[in-house]
């Protein structure tokens, strides 16, 4: 049984009716008035009065000049790892042809990239330019022909953050648009005068973006509906309290709704992490947000065994899961529900956020029970095909006709009988 030594508040069930109605109204405006509505929302929410929503090549080139040599080198290094892993993953997704379950019946599948995608890169509290690399790079590796991206402008400037623009360009984005929010999701779902709709939209955003993705799903594909960021750390008493505290606060600083959880087999260690968190908050630049998040949703529990921690992790299905224990390899086979796994004290969760090569766009709110994060396969379709010899067609037709009659579908049976 887990003993809680630092308790989180229960996340209240938010009344989403107003949110749903607001987002539905925005979507309706974009569908009805197109670019005119987009520009109005751009000005209302971001103070942006730019005439052209599409970012020009000149703007992108100017963004490169704003970056220092080290900043550009860092972006290129991170992109290298993300691209290398995406390309390696692509090689694991193979076509299948001429599989024959019985004589004369030939089955297979093709791996086909979607034609177009939109990569939504958040602005908000922090310009998450790393997200541009995480979204567009696997799309490029998948072979998507038209990769678009959008991000809100830096308020009052009319321009997207320079690092974000450069990251989009490095990752191979074909079209960049200066807009965000629910209105951006609607535009790329239904299209406007200046924006052609896409096949799939990927990327995180605020609750308005998330609700818009939910409402537009079906008209457009999405990666998943994401909630606040979360990390679960499993640690024994031999871990570093300072390291664990830093990892918990790295998650907490995302926003006031982020959640950091520690499960440990050592109560004294858990208490030392609480102390280390307090010390770190004294010097953290983002302490205001991190403090509110940690006080509200941070949690530390003491487990009787690491197996109990594993059981909890599988039920919770965290976005990020850290194994900060002496023998992490013993736990890995037992873990089945997580967005991304970080093995051992050397492997900080923030490394995956930026540059190790795995993707940081991951499922939250227990969605890791049924899906993984964004990867090259997000942009690929597995499409089956089949062919038959005349002999096989005649042989299988009576079977199909009998089954069709059993379901009361005489038209199906007739179509099968024509092949006898």
Protein language model regions, located:
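Conserved small-residue-rich beta-alpha loop and adjacent elements
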Residues: 96-166
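Alpha-helix C-terminal capping segments
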Residues: 134-145, 169-171, 189-196, 213, ...
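A glycine- and small/hydrophobic-rich beta-loop-beta segment
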Residues: 254, 262-338
């Amino acid at each position: 049984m887990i003993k809680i030594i630092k308790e989180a508040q229960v996340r209240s069930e938010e009344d989403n009716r107003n949110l749903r109605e607001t987002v539905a109204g925005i979507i309706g405006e974009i569908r009805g008035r197109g670019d005119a509505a987009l520009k109005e929302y751009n000005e209302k929410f971001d103070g942006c009065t730019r005439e052209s929503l599409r970012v020009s090549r000149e703007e992108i080139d100017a963004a490169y000049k704003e970056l220092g040599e080290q900043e550009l080198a860092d972006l290129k290094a991170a992109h290298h790892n993300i691209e290398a892993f995406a390309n390696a993953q692509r090689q694991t997704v193979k076509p299948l042809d001429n599989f024959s379950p019985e004589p004369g019946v030939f089955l297979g599948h093709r791996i086909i990239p979607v034609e177009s995608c939109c990569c939504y890169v958040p602005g908000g509290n922090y310009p998450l330019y790393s997200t541009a690399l995480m979204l567009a790079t696997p799309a490029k590796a998948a072979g998507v022909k038209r990769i678009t991206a959008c991000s809100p402008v830096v308020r009052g400037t009319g321009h997207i953050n320079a690092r974000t623009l450069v990251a989009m360009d490095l990752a191979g984005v074909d079209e960049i648009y200066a807009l965000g929010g629910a209105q951006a999701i609607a535009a790329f779902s239904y299209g406007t005068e200046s924006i052609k709709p896409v096949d799939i939209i990927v990327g995180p955003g605020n609750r308005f973006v998330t609700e818009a993705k939910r409402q537009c799903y079906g008209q457009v594909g999405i990666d998943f509906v994401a909630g606040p960021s979360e990390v679960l750390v499993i640690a024994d008493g031999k871990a570093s309290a300072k390291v664990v505290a830093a990892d918990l606060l790295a998650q907490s600083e995302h926003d006031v709704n982020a959640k950091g959880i520690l499960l440990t087999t050592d109560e004294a260690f858990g208490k030392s992490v609480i102390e280390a968190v307090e010390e770190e908050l004294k010097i953290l630049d983002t302490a205001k947000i991190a403090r509110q998040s940690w006080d509200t949703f941070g949690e530390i529990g003491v487990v009787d065994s690491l197996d109990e921690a594993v059981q909890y992790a599988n039920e919770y299905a965290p976005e990020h899961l850290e194994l900060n224990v002496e023998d992490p390899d013993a736990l890995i086979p037992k873990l089945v529900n997580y967005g991304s796994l970080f093995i051992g004290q050397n492997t900080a969760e923030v490394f995956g956020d930026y540059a190790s090569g795995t993707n940081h766009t991951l499922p939250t709110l227990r969605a890791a029970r049924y899906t993984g994060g964004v990867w090259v396969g997000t942009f690929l379709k597995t499409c089956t095909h089949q062919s038959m010899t005349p002999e096989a067609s005649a042989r299988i037709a009576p079977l199909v006709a009998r089954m069709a009659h059993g379901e009361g579908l005489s038209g199906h049976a007739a179509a099968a009988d024509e092949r006898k």
